[in-house]
Amino acid sequence: MKHHLTPLDATQLDSWRALAAHRQELQDFRMRQAFIDDPERFKRFSFSACGLFLDFSKNLVRQDTIDLLVKLAEEARLSDAIRAMFDGEAINASERRPVLHTALRRPIGDKVLVDGVDVMPEVHRVLHQMTELVGYVHNGLWRGYTEKPITDVVNIGIGGSFLGPQLVSEALLPFAQKGVRCHYLANIDGSEFHELACRLNAETTLFIVSSKSFGTLETLKNAQAARAWYLAQGGTEEELYRHFIAVSSNKEAAIAFGIREENVFPMWDWVGGRYSLWSAIGLPIAMSIGISNFKELLSGAYNMDQHFQTAPFERNIPVLLGLLGVWYGDFWGARSHAILPYDYYLRNITDHLQQLDMESNGKSVRQDGTPVTSGTGPVIWGGVGCNGQHAYHQLLHQGTQLIPADFIVPVSSYNPVADHHQWLYANCLSQSQALMLGKSREEAEAELRAKGLPEAEVQRLAPHKVIPGNRPSNTLVVERISARRLGALIAMYEHKVYVQSILWGINAFDQWGVELGKELGKGVYSRLVGSEEKPAEDASTQGLIDFFRGRHRG
């Protein structure tokens, strides 16, 4: 059976029914008691792979829960689905395309066929092209129109052409190469362009225009603005090729813009935008951290690919995380998932994972077009650790929703200040511990009495200090963020998303919902500027158009 042609209805499997019954058995399950009853629980539910240490012991599971979840994966023929992706089958059924971002991190000598053609020589040709360009820039050989070396590289792109590269560039800032600064321009808001341009010198700035079609509205508008700025600063049309390169499958449009053919890096239909940081879309990453570190990033992702393909499901990090996500979404009613990195350099990981997860699994029909019979992708949210503790962690602890969380933390800091990192690590662990333990009414009352409060005051305050606990979380620990470990971490989440899509029977690699807003946006714009007088499809939109037109002044 081809999953992408005849998706499975997992809700009809015996293992799904067994999990539903098992969920009722766990109605009164308490993690706090489970740790007391089983001194080996942490050892049983934690292990290392690819430079990552996963502790999943603070979950609403027993060993038989894990066994049932693994049985679900086996009955859903997850192994076949994994093999189909890596073999280049057209698992993106709606667009009839293979999904081969994994090919971008495979070593020389491997063979991957697309329509009978081995794509690996082309993958490594482009990687070599990237290596040469990065070397020219870092060695001061790529020069602007006044013969000054490039000092600033600006990536113009949005979505997958922005979120992944920005995450990696920021996460690996300790590896940044001296002499070249990297910036990102994504939003069509003119204020973003203005603030960035104020910090740049046109003589020493190189723009990378990243757009598969070379027609993405936000990217093209920003590229045109950058072009106009360059010319206004004294640049010439004849020398424009020194300041603009492109990553696009539309070579003709890039050349028409003024970019030389040899400076147009290709994109392939078998790599989706949110999975593209491993391709030439990752040029700003390589510009920032150097090509050798970029290759380390690829190597770490490749290690995770191997782990995903070969590790038994019960010791397979992306498979386990995917199964736990289904467990909470479909059997416990969880509708969101928090990503909580306790590392300043990982502050953008939540943004990337929002696109990766929600654009992939935010679907309501299966691969064959029939409605889903289960839940699908959760809302992904969160942010950098300690800041969240003073903001939304309150909801995690005492809110009415069950919200699973992933804590991500390094053992060592690149920038140790006194005992700051020990406190950071302690905060991470204590938050996951507090979510699990909670605080009972008896404990709250005892705490208040110990402070000498009158009994009436104890009874008044105690209900507010009760914390339910039993809130699930995973903790991912790395020794220190490196290119290799970061590659493994990002690939881990990519594969987790795919695992869940298989169990839900959906296509994780299209995004038709995104297209509707783009289509309607053209009509709204035409009405805003007065080139279309026909009213909008609804009174609300038309009213807001009229409000804008009545007040807008340039």
Curated annotation (Swiss-Prot):
It catalyses: alpha-D-glucose 6-phosphate = beta-D-fructose 6-phosphate. It holds the Pfam family PGI. Pathway: Carbohydrate biosynthesis; gluconeogenesis; Carbohydrate degradation; glycolysis; D-glyceraldehyde 3-phosphate and glycerone phosphate from D-glucose: step 2/4. Keywords: Cytoplasm, Gluconeogenesis, Glycolysis, Isomerase. GO terms for cellular component: cytosol. The active site is at E359, H390, K518. One of its GO terms (biological process) is gluconeogenesis. Its main location: cytoplasm. The keyword Transmembrane helix does not apply. It is found in: Cytoplasm. Its EC number is 5.3.1.9. GO terms for molecular function: carbohydrate derivative binding; glucose-6-phosphate isomerase activity; monosaccharide binding. InterPro entries: G6P_Isomerase, G6P_Isomerase_C, Phosphoglucose_isomerase_CS, SIS_dom_sf, SIS_PGI_1, SIS_PGI_2. Belongs to the GPI family. PANTHER family: GLUCOSE-6-PHOSPHATE ISOMERASE. Catalyzes the reversible isomerization of glucose-6-phosphate to fructose-6-phosphate. This is Glucose-6-phosphate isomerase. The gene is pgi.
